[in-house]
UniProtKB/Swiss-Prot annotation:
This is Probable cytosol aminopeptidase. It catalyses: Release of an N-terminal amino acid, Xaa-|-Yaa-, in which Xaa is preferably Leu, but may be other amino acids including Pro although not Arg or Lys, and Yaa may be Pro. Amino acid amides and methyl esters are also readily hydrolyzed, but rates on arylamides are exceedingly low; Release of an N-terminal amino acid, preferentially leucine, but not glutamic or aspartic acids. Its cofactor is Mn(2+). It is found in: Cytoplasm. It comes from Methylobacterium radiotolerans (strain ATCC 27329 / DSM 1819 / JCM 2831 / NBRC 15690 / NCIMB 10815 / 0-1). Belongs to the peptidase M17 family.
């Protein structure tokens, strides 16, 4: 968790003050090593010369996301000076504020630090300071609750106290509260993805999602008997090989006008995916505890929205199952009847996530009549082959929604790339024996999977995010060192903030 970090805000005038001369003072420089006026004042007349001499000795060039640590000069109220590089003027013009916050937090881990957000040519805004704080919080996250033997330096993984100093510190403090709400949502999602499947089975996942009621979210949990009444033959088939019964959790945040249709966020929640009868190879199967990354993102997003009292109506829905093989498991060649009435020939029991989504989407459309649907799922290995582990695949039937999601991804760094949906992909899932089959062959696997889901969204604007490459075991970044990334929470929050909240 990121519980060890405390972030406050203060005026630039505090740059030269410190508790008993202890802790760190953090200043920023570009590739010309110039200090901002507040940093110069804090360091005194010889400060710039001190930094220049230390930089020359250590071959520090002020490159973006580089750092230099040295003993602080006398009288600055700190015992260590940390100089963080911002790069060239071009680099500074496109500063990634969460990344800068995460990098800075990593350089002052376990210490008290005053961070002077001031450098030549830039007046740091409250919003930018909030993004900086968000990155710092996310960087300090660690999932170590099951480790009984901590490393000797374990305490150095979190910041004791970080005070961000800038001109508009009052507004920045308000932005910091928003950053805390958002980071809490991301951290919740990371925790869920990182949990082992013997702990996070469907009923336990549903229990944790239900805790959002404390924030004012309305919770409804569907158990198997109710699913059978609704005719959810697709989802129930996936679950029938497991001793752990499935759950569907419906989470409603009613922050907008009562008559306004909600935005629906839908997540695949396969808490462990063995592949079922079409069992996966042993190598890497342990990663399949993360096959619920889409559901985790939806829960995290609802947490963030409710915590900041978002002015909109949002319904989150997650289908939680375990896909296991036993004598009662569903089989290749089975024909299932989904809640929509459409029939599905099972070709591969390891193509289970789309079956779960089909019934959850139908239920959400019928019960809430959403204005738009965004589903998130760790759906296919094919999307990793196509896009790697830095970007998610997006499929959509609506250009406006797709454009808005793309913009939210660019703004947050949770980037998406739109993939094609053409009739040929839809034709590939036609079945000789049922309305459709659950796989479309070897080629274009991500697209045929999306085409399957598309058959269930009716005429609602819809986007499908295949997050198999980014939700777990993705490339490390300045704001994430966790196996479970919590990917999607920030994107969904930004999408709703920019396009669905009342102004």
């Amino acid at each position: 968790m990121a519980d060890g970090i405390e972030i406050g805000f203060g005026p630039l005038e505090q740059s030269g003050q410190g508790p008993g001369g202890s802790g760190d003072l953090v200043v920023f420089v570009g590739d010309d090593l110039s200090l901002g006026s507040a940093a110069r004042e804090a360091l005194g007349a010889s400060g710039a010369d001190l930094v220049a001499r230390a930089a020359a000795s250590e071959k520090f060039k002020g490159r973006s996301l580089s750092a230099l640590s040295l003993p602080a000069p006398a009288g600055v109220g700190a015992d260590r000076l940390v100089v963080v590089g911002l790069g060239s003027e071009k680099d500074r013009a496109k500063t990634d504020w969460p990344a800068l916050g995460g990098f800075t937090a990593s350089k002052v881990a376990g210490r008290t630090a005053r961070v002077v957000l001031d450098w030549p040519g830039t007046t740091v805004t409250a919003a930018q300071a909030g993004e900086f704080a968000l990155g710092a919080r996310l960087r300090t996250y660690a999932f170590d609750r099951y480790k009984t033997k901590k490393k000797p330096d374990a305490d150095d993984k979190s910041v004791t106290a970080l005070t961000l100093l800038l001109a508009d510190h009052g507004a920045a403090a308000r932005e910091g509260e928003g950053a805390r709400s958002l980071s809490d949502g991301v951290i919740l999602a990371r925790d869920l993805v990182n949990e082992p499947p013997n702990v996070l089975f469907p009923a336990e996942f549903a229990r944790r999602a239900s805790e959002l009621a404390k924030l004012g979210v309305e919770i409804e949990v569907l158990e198997p008997a109710r699913m059978r009444e609704l005719g959810m033959g697709a989802l129930l088939a996936v679950a029938q090989g497991s001793a752990r019964e499935p759950r569907i959790v419906i989470m409603r945040w009613n922050g907008g006008p009562a008559a306004e249709a909600p935005v629906a966020l839908i997540g695949k929640g396969v808490v462990f995916d063995s592949g079922g009868v079409s069992i996966k190879p042993g190598g890497g199967m342990e990663d399949m505890k993360g096959d619920m990354g889409g559901a985790a993102a939806v829960v995290g997003a609802l947490h963030a929205l409710a915590a900041r009292k978002a002015r909109c109506n949002v319904v989150g829905a997650i289908g939680i199952v375990e896909n296991m093989p036993d004598g009662g498991a569903y089989r290749p060649s089975d024909i299932l009847t989904s809640m929509s009435g459409q029939t599905i020939e099972v070709i591969n029991t390891d193509a289970e996530g789309r079956l779960v989504l089909a019934d959850v989407i139908t239920h959400v459309i019928r019960s809430t009549k959403p204005k738009a649907i965004v589903d998130l799922a760790t759906l296919t290995g094919a999307i990793i082959v196509a896009l790697g582990q830095d970007i998610a695949g997006m499929f959509s039937n609506d250009d406006t929604l797709a454009s808005n999601i793309h913009a939210a991804g660019e703004a947050t760094g949770e980037k998406v790339w739109r993939m094609p949906l053409i009739p040929a992909y839809d034709k590939a899932i036609d079945s000789k024996f049922a309305d459709m089959k659950n796989t479309g062959g070897r080629h274009g696997g991500a697209a045929t999977a999306a085409s399957f889901i598309k058959r269930y969204v009716e005429d609602v604007p819809w986007a499908h995010l295949d997050i198999a490459g980014v939700a777990m075991s993705s490339n490390a970044s300045e704001i994430n060192r966790s196996w479970g990334a919590g990917w999607g929470v920030r994107l969904l929050d930004r999408l709703i903030r920019d396009h669905y909240e009342a102004r």
